[in-house]
UniProtKB/Swiss-Prot annotation:
This is Alanine--tRNA ligase. Its EC number is 6.1.1.7. Zn(2+) binds at residues 572, 576, 673, 677. Its main location: cytoplasm. GO terms for molecular function: alanine-tRNA ligase activity; aminoacyl-tRNA deacylase activity; ATP binding; tRNA binding; zinc ion binding. Binds 1 zinc ion per subunit. It is an enzyme of class 6 (ligase). One of its GO terms (cellular component) is cytosol. It catalyses: tRNA(Ala) + L-alanine + ATP = L-alanyl-tRNA(Ala) + AMP + diphosphate. The gene is alaS. HAMAP family: Ala_tRNA_synth_B.
Length: 884
């Protein structure tokens, strides 16, 4: 491997950040691969995602110049490159995007000249190798390139609209049909005439000669619903440059998989799979997917059968599938992680910190996949054998996915190898039907939302509930029902009430919404059954009107159910202490995956790979209760996000935080949290874990109770202990020893019983041999044996077979009115003519039973009654008919 060392991938990354730092930019870290501000987006797929709210005006930032290296993923939804990865020069699931941004500060002049300076002066790219494009009407950018930078006119290409549609151009960027938009200018690298392809905008533009390096977007307009463009008061700059394709150019190689970073990963993949040909495309797949999987897991995504977890599982299994194609039958993929850490860990310390967790997650998925592949292949083969037209039915592909965890793309791959295909339309129809069936109807209020137009007219609800649980002067600003907005509601109606201020906490962060009462001075009374957050900023009181009526503009008083809120606060604070204890016991790979903070209990889901032992459970419980007894003051403080992180505060995966955050500290626990809490940890009183289980691969769940609920749980357990002691004639202090003595005695009696059964069977065998009937030199035994269970029955059958060289045997064990049947065919004279499974069916049908098995052995059952005797008496005749 001969990779130029002057511009390694690592150096390119650091050069970029250093360059823009010197230009006055604040260097910000990569946002997580799971967007915190856009629920419609599966993954962060570009550098602008974390700044979307800034461009939309929903978020204000103190800094006006920013640069970063953003981790991106394109493997699901609209931006899905998965099927192309490994087989093309520049497709990846995971990639890094270099970007610099201006929020109303510098504009085209600086963006263009700095880009040229970095490319030609710092990275020493020959200017004659570069070509730029501009939007057809963007004369300003054209002039800057020609007059200020000095690019010849024959190296500047104006790009118009596609198919004549206004602003539908590769060189005009828009977030949506309306909103921020503007022209962009792109910088291309010319690989030379020996590479096929023409310049951008030409018929041959899809060739590989001209490769886009950098896209500079100038957001200067606000597109209206009628298509007109209104200049923005503060234009912005958004640029993006793919690190991998830039590295390929600077390292003088043609494909991204030839750069230093990928070559290191490919060589490791070749070592793990024992493949000598490092050009094998499967190695590219494994190398690429190792990055995507590791960074997804680092950012809190775990393999599952839905959503982002399903995409991760697909990527993992695609890599494992390619390993399987290379002949690998043992786990290998997890061993890519140390090499990945070696080449990317310095740039991403969180990858280094989570390496062990990533490896364990991948190993668990590899072991799971081996089982899935074994079972799934058997089912696939059964389905394929029945297919006459070469099309695997969509319903069967869905059954493989839904029941056996067999990814549909894997089914499609295997089908393709056999000259078949999957009915994907049928698969999607089955998937859609399942979603409809599984979608819970939900209680009133959860599906109701404000329109964007109405929301724009309202100010966010002011939450008073941190300091007070009762408040007056709450003005009704909107009323919603299942039918949408309404101006008024009357007695008996269920309606969501939005007020300008409220003491009611809206469900968020796992904490349930408050309940209570809304009232007016004229006797109006509304029962608040829940409080939900609408559009992330409005508190919706889910109510039933029990007296009077309410209309928009009314002024109400609100009272939160105080006792319930306090119980919720106990459990929320206990959740923080539990989270801290879990990380202390198991390590920093523990991360919250979900929670429920209710008045009667708390539920906490977290990343961990194995069941918790009794000793570990006791330790965790003790650690939490130690913090409770320490009676720490719960301190709550507002501070900047970076200051909070520097102070050791835990930010929860999937939560969206602003520049200023609320930090909750109690003892050694420090978390960012918007929930309600107690004053001191001692208020919790007692913390008690009541259950622990797994909820999905790599995710465990603990349920616990606090305060009076914990005391009641302990008292109930104590009551059960005394009840058990009474049943066994012991006292509570000696229950364990007494039960141990009873179980030892039981084992002794069971051994004695087995000996007696053995003697009974020996005597029974002697009796059965004496009843054997000779039919054409084949011994036929058909007998009823009262009191023998299935195990004893099979033992008797095996002993008879040892003593009868040619025999047909039917034994019926009768216990409690039920019949257990076993049949056997033994020896050359009977085998081939008499089949045990056919004989069993003949007998079983006569006693309202059924069964099955092989030609030499079968078992089944039925009901006791007069017909059993006649069925057994007829066995010899049946055998004779089949032997003749």
């Amino acid at each position: 491997m001969n990779i130029p060392t002057k511009f390694t991938t690592s150096k390119i990354r650091s050069d970029f950040l250093e360059f823009f730092k010197n230009k006055g930019h604040k260097i910000v870290p990569s946002a997580p691969l799971v967007p915190g501000n856009d629920p419609t987006l599966l993954f962060t797929n570009s550098g602008m995602v974390q700044f979307k709210d800034v461009f939309l005006g929903a978020e204000k930032r103190s800094e006006v110049r920013v640069a970063d290296v953003q981790c991106c993923l394109r493997a699901g939804g609209k931006h899905n490159d998965l099927d192309s990865v490994g087989y093309t020069a520049r497709h990846h699931t995971f990639f890094e995007m270099l970007g610099n941004w201006s929020f109303g500060d510098y504009f085209k002049k600086e963006a263009i000249t700095w880009a040229w300076e970095l490319l030609t002066h710092v990275w020493e790219l020959p200017p004659e190798r570069l070509l730029v494009t501009v939007y057809r009407t963007d004369d300003e950018s054209y002039a800057l390139w020609r007059d200020m930078v000095g690019v010849p006119e024959d190296r500047i290409v104006r790009i118009g609209d596609n198919k004549g549609a206004p602003f539908a151009s590769d060189n005009f960027w828009q977030m949506a049909d309306t909103g921020p938009c503007g022209p962009c200018t792109e910088i291309f690298y010319d690989h030379g005439e020996h590479i096929p392809g023409g310049p951008p905008g030409s018929p041959g533009e899809d060739g590989d000669r001209f490769i886009e390096i950098w896209n500079l977007v100038f957001m200067q307009f606000d597109r209206q619903s009628d298509g007109t463009l209104v200049p923005l008061p503060t234009p912005c700059v958004d640029t993006g440059m793919g690190l991998e394709r830039l590295a390929a150019i600077l390292q003088h190689v043609h494909t991204n998989y030839e750069i230093d970073l990928f070559q290191t990963l490919i060589l490791k993949a070749a070592e793990l799979t024992a493949v000598a040909d490092v050009q094998n495309k499967s190695l590219c797949v494994i190398a690429d997917h190792s990055r995507a999987c590791a960074f997804l897991i680092v950012d809190g995504v775990l393999p599952s059968n839905e959503g982002r977890g399903y995409v991760l599982r697909r990527i993992i299994r695609r890599a494992l599938r390619h390993g399987w194609m290379l002949g690998v039958r043992q786990p290998f993929f997890n061993n890519m992680v140390p090499t990945l850490v070696a080449v990317m860990g310095d740039a991403y310390p969180k990858l280094q910190a989570a390496a062990e967790s990533v490896m364990r997650t991948l190993l668990a998925e590899e072991e799971r996949f081996a089982e899935t592949l074994d079972v799934g292949m058997k089912i696939f083969n059964e389905v394929a054998a029945k297919v006459a037209n070469g099309v695997i039915p969509g319903s069967d592909a869905f059954r493989l996915y839904d029941t056996y965890g067999f990814p549909v793309d894997l089914t499609a791959d295997i089908a393709r190898e056999r000259g078949m295909r999957v009915d994907m339309a049928g698969f999607e129809a089955a998937m859609t039907q399942q979603r409809k069936t599984a979608r819970a109807a939900g209680k009133f209020g959860r599906g109701v939302q404000l329109s964007a137009e109405r929301a724009a007219m309202l100010s966010p609800t002011v939450f008073l509930g941190y300091e007070q649980l009762q408040a007056d002067g709450l003005r009704v600003v909107a009323l919603l029902s299942d039918g949408g907005l309404t101006d008024s509601a009357s007695v008996g109606d269920e309606v969501i009430v939005l007020t300008d201020r409220t003491p009611f906490y809206a469900e968020s962060g796992g904490q349930v919404g408050d309940i209570g009462t809304l009232m007016a001075s004229d006797g109006v009374r509304l029962e608040v059954t829940d409080t939900q957050k609408l559009m992330g900023q409005f508190h919706g009181h889910v109510t039933r009107i029990v007296q009077g009526g309410v209309k928009v503009g009314d002024v109400l008083s609100g009272s939160v159910a105080v006792a319930r809120r306090k119980m919720v606060a106990l459990n929320h604070s206990a959740t923080h202490l539990l989270h801290c204890a879990l990380r202390s016991v198991f390590g920093t790979h523990v991360a919250q995956k979900g929670s429920l903070v209710a008045p009667d209990r708390l539920r906490f889901d977290f990343s961990h790979f194995e069941p918790i032992s009794a000793a570990q459970m006791t330790l965790i419980e003790r650690m939490v209760n130690d913090e409770v007894r320490a009676n720490h003051l719960v301190m709550i403080e507002q501070m900047g996000m970076q200051a909070a992180l520097d102070a050791g505060a835990m930010a929860l995966f999937g939560e969206k935080y602003g520049e200023h955050v609320r930090v909750v500290k109690m003892g050694t626990s420090v978390e960012l949290c918007g929930g309600t809490h107690i004053t001191r940890t001692g208020d919790i009183g007692l913390f008690k874990i009541i259950s622990e289980c797994g909820v999905s691969s790599g995710v465990r769940r603990i349920e616990a109770v606090t305060g009076e609920s914990a005391l009641n749980h302990v008292l109930a357990e104590e009551h059960r202990l005394y009840e058990v002691a009474g049943l066994i004639g012991s006292n509570a202090n000696d229950v364990v020893n007494h039960i141990r003595q009873l179980t030892d005695r039981q084992k002794t009696l069971e051994r004695e019983l087995e000996k007696l059964k053995g003697k009974l069977i020996s005597g029974t065998i002697t009796d059965l041999l004496s009843t054997a009937v000779n039919v054409a030199d084949v011994k036929v035994v058909a007998a009823r044996l009262d009191g023998l269970d299935g195990k004893a029955l099979r033992e008797a059958l095996d002993r008879l077979k040892l003593q009868l060289s040619d025999a047909v045997i039917v034994l019926a064990g009768v216990t409690g009115g039920k019949v257990a049947l076993v049949t056997a065919v033994n020896g050359p004279r009977a085998m081939g003519k008499v089949k045990a499974d056919t004989l069993l069916s003949h007998v079983a049908t006569q006693i309202n039973g059924r069964g099955g098995g092989r030609v030499d052995f079968a078992q089944g059952g039925g009901e006791d009654g007069p017909s059993l005797r006649s069925a057994l008496d007829g066995v010899a005749t049946w055998v004779k008919q089949h032997l003749d």
